[in-house]
Amino acid sequence: MKTQEFKYVSYLWDDAKAAELAGDEVALLIYRSNLLGADLRLTNYGGGNTSCKVSEKDPLTGGETDVMWVKGSGGDLGTLKKSGLAALYLDRLHSLEKVYRGIAHEDEMVELFNHCIFDLASKAPSIDTPLHAFLPFKHIDHLHPDALIAIAAAKDGKALTLSLFKGTIGWVEWQRPGFDLGLKLRQCLQENPDIRGIVLGSHGLFTWGDTAYESYLNTLEVIEQSAAYLESQYGKKGPVFGGQKLTSPAEEDRKKQAIALAPTLRGFCSEKTRMIGHFTDDARVLEFINSNDLERLAPMGTSCPDHFLRTKISPLVLELPPGEDLNDNKATKEKLAPAFEAYRAMYAAYYEQCKHPDSPAMRDANPVVILYPGIGMFTFAKDKQTARVAAEFYINAINVMKGAEAVSEYTSLPRQEAFNIEYWLLEEAKLQRMPKPKALSGRIALVTGSAGGIGKAIAKNSPMKAPVLSSTTMMPAGLNRPKMSSVSNTAAIRSHRC
């Protein structure tokens, strides 16, 4: 496929840049990863991983040994550096199969990855490490593209994959990532040696190549083909999302409603932990929340594990008319209280029904995603960035539902499978390793008198402790117009109000 033929993904490969990295496969891996991570249509923030296999001099023997460099635990492909990679002895990873005790003992394998580390400066290996290790290809990409997950999450996903790609893409049914899934990928390849990639049901895509460029191009071509197919199917079964049930007010009116409602929603969501909010009325969000199918699809939840880890099991849909009078804050709170109580009860029931004897304690039962039909989507999290990323992930989920419904029927993960991911002990350990909240975490700070002196110093220091900061200096009449300090901007002011 020629570069100009890509319509639904961005071809960013620069031959001149790649030539500068020629001979350094790890540098080319990082370059490829950054290009893939730069396009949110290819993978979500922090999602997916990439790898390459090279021959290195073994510091223990002086001889050559095969080493796999793979994105480590955490981090984002778009900003990946060498420090974010894990380097492991490939033969040691393969030898772990001898001590693998079966799927009931998956979690113990993660600690054993540490015994396979080649580069002592490595990032901690991720749970996806064996998925790369048991495929023989030099360069491998594992991504979560919306267009492909739409097919992977469709009721007829396996048949659609076979039909669309004419047998050149394999299929592995949904399974929680881990050592056994790596063995399943190897088995799929052994049974289908000529395939160019593998779809993981309700999860994502694996593609590969002999070189960094071949892997990159293969990945783009598969995702492009998926997106083009979906685009050709929209509207054939009927209107998208069953057609529009209501029409949104003008953008200015939507923003007014959002500004009026956001503090109340933040109050509900901050019942246990102080939260920061984000609002979007993106066209994709409006198409979904204004549709006839919202009531059916929203409670189903998401499919891709990355999606519900960021957005919770399902959103809260508000039963408020778009033109609701929100000036009386007390009346609004009384009207919304039952909805939040019902959501918390739903989440608690989900936890009680699905928990295991060793499950971590139930986390905050408040919603992360709140949908206001006609107006937009609110997301709440510990800081502004996390709230924004949660919104991105739910838009990913909307894209997946839209595509799956266009070609088949959307299916979400069963609640028990979702719980097993959300309350996975390995996920809990990752949460426990995160830095503790700072003094003003979850709070919104307003600094006055910040154009100079003490106020300016406070304003510059506060972002280290408070995620959202607004600062201003009022000047006497007749002097220069009011100034905002260098750390402030209109977005921060909007965040303060919302």
What are these regions (language model features)?
Residues 451-453, 475:
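Conserved glycine-rich cofactor-binding loop
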Residues 174, 472, 498:
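Glycine- and other small-residue-rich loops at beta-strand/loop junctions that grip anionic moieties
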Residues 454, 479-482, 486:
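Generic hydrophobic, amphipathic alpha-helix propensity
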Residues 486-498:
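Rossmann-fold cofactor-recognition segment
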Residues 463-464, 488:
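Residues at the C-terminal ends
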Residues 1-445, 450, 457, 461:
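Glycine-rich flexible loops
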Residues 467-481:
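Conserved glycine-rich Rossmann-like NAD(P)H-binding loop of the short-chain dehydrogenase/reductase
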